[in-house]
Amino acid sequence: VAPKTEAAFAACVDLLRDAADWPEPEVLRRQAEDRITAATPAAAVWKYFTENPPLTSAGHMRRLEAAQAVSPKDVQRLASESWRTATFKPADEQEFLNRYGTSLTPDDNIARFDRIMREGRPQVAKDMLSKLPPTYQPLASARLAMATRAADTVQILRGVAPAQLDTPAVRLERLQWLRRTGNL
């Protein structure tokens, strides 16, 4: 099989199974996820994703669709997991939120924000602000201000409850901010 294949989903899955030593299996897994169509049996998709966690935003969406058909009790857990761990293409993210947004908790949104910040993507994290619980938004704004070296960072930090600032992640962000701004 060439690095880029037009093989159907089932053929990609068969190759993954039969050629366990295939170099860069992630390439085949991504291609398998891209090959899932509306005609692909939900049970086959579900089986695939129970053995291979999704790698793409489309894969996360197809896994959730299969779960709705085959194992509805898992949809909320998988939606939470996907939201916390996946990076979605903009169109997939909107579709995900339209379909599964009501399954998400405030903790899911905080976890996603935290992950995006750890990945060093404050501009993407900024888009999460409105989804965060009101009690967390001042801290999120302060973290964004530190990450982007905003001129009013000190003022924004003063608006955050001291208890919220006393977590390992926030202390690390403060130290990094102080170092970047030459104040450490």
Regions found by a protein language model. Give the residues of each.
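Alpha-helical solenoid repeat scaffolds
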Residues: 1-184
